[in-house]
Amino acid sequence: MRLSQMLFVTLRDDPADAEIPSHKLLVRAGFIRRLGSGLYAYLPLIWRVLEKVKRIVQEEMNRTGAQECLLPQLQPSELWKMSGRWDTYTESEGIMFALRDRLERELGLGPTHEEVITAIAKEMIRSYRQLPVNLYQIQTKFRDEIRPRFGLMRGREFIMKDAYSFHSDEASLKATYGAMDQAYRNIFSRCGLDFRPVDADSGAIGGSGSQEFMVLADAGEDEILYTEDGLYSANVEKAVSLAPDAKPSPFSGYKKQSAPNTATIAKMCQCLDCDASNVVKNVLYQAVYNSGKAVLVLVSIRGDQEVNEVKLTNELTKLAPHYESTNILSLTVPDEKEQQKWAAKPLPLGYISPGISDDYIATNKQVADKFLRLVDQTAVDLTNFATGADAVDYHVTGANWSTDFTLPKLVVDVRKALAGDRPVHDPTGELKTARGIEVGHIFQLGTKYSQAMGATFTNEQGEEKPLVMGCYGIGVSRLAQAAVEQSYDKDGIIWPTAIAPYEVVIVVPNVGDEEQMQVAEQIYTEFQAAEVDVLLDDRNERAGVKFKDSELIGIPYRVVTGKSLKQGQLEVVKRADKSVQNLAIAAVVPTLTAWIKAEKKTS
């Protein structure tokens, strides 16, 4: 491609709305252009990157036996109502673009396709002889993000590869799950990324187990906890650990104490002269289930620990059937205005005890009449602890479970694991932290969707059984930007060779110099014959502008038909480290072709 013929415009300054380096660079280098909030045009350079990523994805997916297809972006609401996710996606998380057609039929623009593929499997898969089968697609998805940001990282439309597998049993699912795990490792390695697979929460997708693939980058939105021995890594939403040991309690004997203006743990501990690990704090939440029922949730946890709301949501989702529901629409800490809707009398906020009376809840059909009480294991283990006294400006000390407070029946792990905690598998070790960008996620769905939607098959014994499912996603457009976030310098992007828009750029310092142009045209033709992706900068611009642009767009190798031409040589600059070599004209194409081939093989 000749740069003089390309739609190519670079910017000197960073765009005002860009917050992270990769977003700034992709806009400045002319790869993407913003059209609206979370909406970007993929311009020719980034499209070449995306096509290369897609090709790698297709090759690795096809190698596993998966079959490519294309599913509709518009999806009937009936399918989502069958699975129980319509309310979650349109009201709770609110991430689905929902609309009505001219006949008032409800439709959604697909953020994901579990319902669609399950409906197809229900009609087409009848027998165990058709299993296992794995279908995938690469296409545009939609999410009505509350706050689109970071360019392609969190947009309202994005390109994704999603695959769905169907099986006769869990053993078959696990085999495909393992194959997808390896395929994903191959994909991200071939794309030249530094990544880490981590245990993850399944979220609204559901299922029994899942794993994320994180590209390590300081600007990553996700926190990862891991051990240096390589035996454990998890998204902080999912991570488990051993809490630090509690300090010895300074209290003995149950006592109610006056403690004015101590509604926070810090002030309470200062007043009572104790450590936060000697305290049972009681955090009040309001959960609203999809039946419309609101439930007041009281979580008792050790005072020096924090509640992981993802873990809490998962625990509350398990209890949904008790409230004639299937999932949670919202989980919030109720403010004073919200409390007025259900409180029979003002709550002693900051001084609540584990045994606070249910009488605080007024009679209301939309609100459960009792607190749902959960206790984290860190609080269960405490003795002679301090906690609220259910009276403003008062706490109790020297309290114990059974004798002073009834231990809740629901003992759970809802604490947030932290860097510095001890790993479960090695109490002598320590969890480290890193930031990551999620580029892939694989799930063992089990029978969640097939049971809800009646997708069954006949097994070898002639019995009708629900299909066992897995699903596997890769954010293709996000991956492209993640590569930039992981590899750039003060001058611009440094693309991994395997997904660079072009592998070589030929810069002609003076297009009016006949010899420079002649040699440039010659090696341009030779690179094309060698099947190297080559870009010829034949613009009538100053040499300095061309050099700056070549560094900004991040092409792995730059060949310059400049001063060394008089010695029968060309200057070759490697973008990654800016090393410079002068090679004989005849050696340039075979040498760079070999380098590029080797880099693709080892990436």
Swiss-Prot record:
Show the GO cellular component annotation of the record: cytosol
- Assembly and interaction partners: Homodimer.
Protein's gene:
proS
Q: What is this protein called?
A: Proline--tRNA ligase
Major localization listed first in the record, in broad terms: cytoplasm
Gene3D superfamilies in UniProt: Anticodon-binding domain (3.40.50.800), Bira Bifunctional Protein, Domain 2 (3.30.930.10)
Under the heading PROSITE patterns, the entry gives:
AA_TRNA_LIGASE_II (PS50862)
Q: Its Gene Ontology biological processes?
A: prolyl-tRNA aminoacylation
Keywords recorded for this protein, A-Z:
Aminoacyl-tRNA synthetase, ATP-binding, Cytoplasm, Ligase, Nucleotide-binding, Protein biosynthesis
Please name the GO terms that the record assigns under molecular function.
aminoacyl-tRNA deacylase activity; ATP binding; proline-tRNA ligase activity
Subcellular locations according to the entry? Cytoplasm
Q: What does this protein do?
A: Catalyzes the attachment of proline to tRNA(Pro) in a two-step reaction: proline is first activated by ATP to form Pro-AMP and then transferred to the acceptor end of tRNA(Pro). As ProRS can inadvertently accommodate and process non-cognate amino acids such as alanine and cysteine, to avoid such errors it has two additional distinct editing activities against alanine. One activity is designated as 'pretransfer' editing and involves the tRNA(Pro)-independent hydrolysis of activated Ala-AMP.
